[in-house]
């Protein structure tokens, strides 16, 4: 490879898992760099669907080692629950192929309780629409230097003191909104302390040795660029760096060893929870995209908001992440649309100025109109198509326009849910 990074280019749920599954078949190491068990994707292999939230999907490959990196917030209960689920579906030796960086922070039941309390304090459209799994509060305690790292789980007195201090502070802050039993959590970790030792490693050293020895690494990005804490639609974002920078720092990668950065982009756009979404379609087209695309979350079951592809967002995403290629996913979902729209710019309604960049000011963004380009639909199934030249001319034109507009080649095109439903360019 030797090091390949897969990143979401929109608001998540682009279909990163499918490409990860394909590429991890050749990878020797598959790693997660940031996020927690809030992100989820399904991988279909050998007729079986596997759900991944916290664990890298390289666990499907019997010859691939897997690492949860230092930038991830690790929920220990979710870690073991996910391992059990994979074993129940027939995957063997998964416990021998997964490691956790000792520098990763621990996501606790306490953090989920804080998440619920914080959302309860917000009103109406001010709600972020989090998954409720405490990812934001986990990163908040990390940033405030009060967090608990994985290696501290094994220092019982230190762990309990830090946890009790956190619980007392949040109880003072939220009062009755903070529903949490610290003794119950302490009891659970007495059991986890016995189960975890064989899974914990020095994460930076593991990656350093892997890159120096020339092993093929596949890095699975979680969430997506537009949910990045610095570059996303703040404050309607997650609490970690979800782009290229987060992948590098979350795993201590040697950037000189990175060969490819793949941006995964859905052929239309979806978003979960609150926040701006300029191309959202609240009419028939949006409903049709949601139903045909089966747009509801693996982690939460929530229905996703749907709309047209926004190339302003995509160019902005490319500016931040410097992709070397695109994986265009779910092109087949557009099979039945007579007309397909794509956003190519925004327009200031007062001045008439055409805006070709994605602004930081969300209030200003809300005032802008969307400038669309319309494409003729192909209105024929493409799932069985295996080469680009065999695609309908209208579908080819759609793909070529994305390449020309962004200046980045499309290297993979998803044409269906199965692993084999992929065109390689």
Curated annotation (Swiss-Prot):
Query: Could you tell me which pathway this protein works in?
Result: Purine metabolism; AMP biosynthesis via de novo pathway; AMP from IMP: step 1/2
Query: Taxonomic lineage per UniProt?
Result: Eukaryota, Fungi, Dikarya, Ascomycota, Pezizomycotina
Q: Which residues form the active site?
A: 13 (proton acceptor), 41 (proton donor)
**What binding details are noted for the cofactor?**
Binds 1 Mg(2+) ion per subunit.
Where GTP is bound, by residue? 12-18, 40-42, 304, 330-332, 414-416
Q: Please list the residues that bind Mg(2+).
A: 13, 40
* GO cellular component term, pick one: cytoplasm
The protein's GO terms of the molecular function aspect are: adenylosuccinate synthase activity; GTP binding; magnesium ion binding
Pfam families assigned: Adenylsucc_synt (PF00709)
Functional summary from the UniProt entry: Plays an important role in the de novo pathway and in the salvage pathway of purine nucleotide biosynthesis. Catalyzes the first committed step in the biosynthesis of AMP from IMP.
Q: Does the keyword Ligase apply?
A: yes
On assembly, the entry states: Homodimer.
Q: Where does substrate bind?
A: 298-304
Q: Which family does this protein fall into?
A: Belongs to the adenylosuccinate synthetase family.
The cross-references to InterPro entries, in alphabetical order and at most eight, read: Adenylosuccin_syn_GTP-bd, Adenylosuccin_syn_Lys_AS, Adenylosuccinate_synth_dom1, Adenylosuccinate_synth_dom2, Adenylosuccinate_synth_dom3, Adenylosuccinate_synthetase, P-loop_NTPase
This protein is called what? Adenylosuccinate synthetase
């Amino acid at each position: 490879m030797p090091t390949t990074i897969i990143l979401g280019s929109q608001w998540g749920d682009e279909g990163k898992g499918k490409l990860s599954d394909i590429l991890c078949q050749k990878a020797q190491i598959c790693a997660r760099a940031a996020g927690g068990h809030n992100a989820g994707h399904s991988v279909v292999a050998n007729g079986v669907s596997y759900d991944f939230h916290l664990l890298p999907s390289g666990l499907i490959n019997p010859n691939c080692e897997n690492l949860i990196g230092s930038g991830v917030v690790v929920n220990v209960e979710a870690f073991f629950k996910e391992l059990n689920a994979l074993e129940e579906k027939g995957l063997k030796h998964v416990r021998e192929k997964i490691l956790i960086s000792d520098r990763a922070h621990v996501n606790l039941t306490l953090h989920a309780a804080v998440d619920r309390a914080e959302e309860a304090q917000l009103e109406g459209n001010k709600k972020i629409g989090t998954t409720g799994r405490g990812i934001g509060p986990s990163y908040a305690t990390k940033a405030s230097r009060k967090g608990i790292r994985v290696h501290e789980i094994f220092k019982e007195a230190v762990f309990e003191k830090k946890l009790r201090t956190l619980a007392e502070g949040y109880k003072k802050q939220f009062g009755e909104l903070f529903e949490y039993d610290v003794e119950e959590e302490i009891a659970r970790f007495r059991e986890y302390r016995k189960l975890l030792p064989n899974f914990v490693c020095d994460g930076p050293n593991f990656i350093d040795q892997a890159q120096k020895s020339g092993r093929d690494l596949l890095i699975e990005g979680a969430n997506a660029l537009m949910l990045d804490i610095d570059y996303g639609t703040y404050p309607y974002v997650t609490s970690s760096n979800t782009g290229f920078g987060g992948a590098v720092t979350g795993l201590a990668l040697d950037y000189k060893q990175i060969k490819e950065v793949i941006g995964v982009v859905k052929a239309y756009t979806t978003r979960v929870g609150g926040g701006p979404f300029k191309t959202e379609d609240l009419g028939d087209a949006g409903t049709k995209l949601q139903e045909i695309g089966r747009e509801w979350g693996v982690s939460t079951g929530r229905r996703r908001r749907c709309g047209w592809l926004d190339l302003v967002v995509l160019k902005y995403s490319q500016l931040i992440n410097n992709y070397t290629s695109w994986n265009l996913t779910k092109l087949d979902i557009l099979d039945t649309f007579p007309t397909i729209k794509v956003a190519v710019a925004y327009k200031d309604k007062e001045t008439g100025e055409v805006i070709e960049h994605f602004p930081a000011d969300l209030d200003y963004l809300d005032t802008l109109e969307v400038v669309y380009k319309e494409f003729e639909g192909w209105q024929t199934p493409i799932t069985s198509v295996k080469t680009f030249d065999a695609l309908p001319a209208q579908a080819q034109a759609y793909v070529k326009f994305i390449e020309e507009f962004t200046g980045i080649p499309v290297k993979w095109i998803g044409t269906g849910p199965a692993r084999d439903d992929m065109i390689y360019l």
